[in-house]
């Protein structure tokens, strides 16, 4: 999956129920940039509802990323540690994709 490929169903970031941030991501690269700038309360809200996993599995079709993000939820990470680890997972996958391309 090309990390720059735009998808039809963007991910919309919220800080809580019925509290949209007005930030969306239509590609994995946009998702990474949004993860770097939204508040940690938004990251926690989406991680523990399973929103990230669902979007990555259903829209981006990435079993690898799905399993790695599921592990973050199971580990119970929060706050800036969550951001750091989520960014690491995304950058690792993007780096792998770019490295393996001919």
Language-model-detected regions and their locations in the chain:
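Terminal, compositionally biased segments used for targeting/anchoring and flexible tails
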Residues: 1-102
């Amino acid at each position: 999956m090309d990390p720059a490929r735009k998808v039809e169903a963007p991910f919309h970031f919220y800080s809580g129920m019925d509290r949209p941030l007005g930030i969306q991501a239509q590609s994995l690269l946009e998702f990474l940039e949004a993860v770097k700038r939204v508040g940690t309360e938004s990251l926690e809200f989406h991680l523990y509802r399973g929103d990230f996993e669902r979007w990555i599995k259903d829209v981006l079709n990435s079993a690898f990323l799905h399993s790695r993000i599921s592990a973050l939820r199971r580990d119970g990470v929060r706050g800036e540690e969550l951001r750091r680890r989520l960014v690491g997972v995304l950058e690792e996958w993007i780096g792998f994709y770019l490295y393996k391309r001919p």
